[in-house]
Amino acid sequence: MYATFTGPVNRNAQLWAALLYAGPGAVLSHETAAEVDGLVDRPSALIHLTIRAGRYLQAAPGIRVHRSRHLRDLRFPAGELPRTWIEDTILDLAETKSGLDDVCGLVTAAFGRHLTTVPPFRSVLAERKRQRWRREISELINAAADGTHSVLEFRYDRDVERAHGLPPSRRQVPFRKRTGPGDSATACTSRMA
C-alpha cells in the first residue's frame, strides 16, 4: 500500500489500508471495531480484522486476522469503515475475557454509551449457541434493560439485593440534594432513591 498524501499516516488511513489488504468481505472487528464505534477509548496496538471462515489471508505486521462463521453480510454507507455490528463486537470481545467483571464492563459500557439496545443484543446472542459467558451476558442484558450502568451496580444487584432478598432499588433516579441551609437545591443522579 502507498499513501497518496504527505505527512504521517493517520489511524483512519491505517484502518482503510488494512481492510484493502484483507480484500472484499473483510471487516474491522474485536478491539478495532470497538474503537471505531466508541466502545473503548484507546486504539489497540493491532488492527483486528475478521474474514469468513475457510478463507486464507497471509499475516501482515500490525494486523490480527480472525475467522468467523458468524460474519453477516454488512452494508455501510460509502466512506464508512466496514466493521462488525456492535453486538457482535461485544460478544467477540467477551470470548477473550477471563473474568466476569471485564465482560460486565463491556456490556454496561455499550448500554451506557447508547451503542446498542436490548432487542438486537438478545437476538445476536440467541444466534450464538456456543458463546462464552452466555448465561452471564443474558443476565447483564436484563440488568442493563433495568437501568444498570456499571459493574458496581450489577454486582450490587446480584450479590447484595437478590442474594439477600432485599427490595429492588430504583436505578438512575434524579433526586434533589441541599448543600446547606439557604442553598438552592442541586439536581443529582443516584442509583438508589
Write out the residue ranges for each language-model feature.
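Short gly/ser-rich loop at a beta-strand->alpha-helix junction or flexible surface loop bordering the NTP-binding
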Residues: 1-135, 157, 164-166, 170
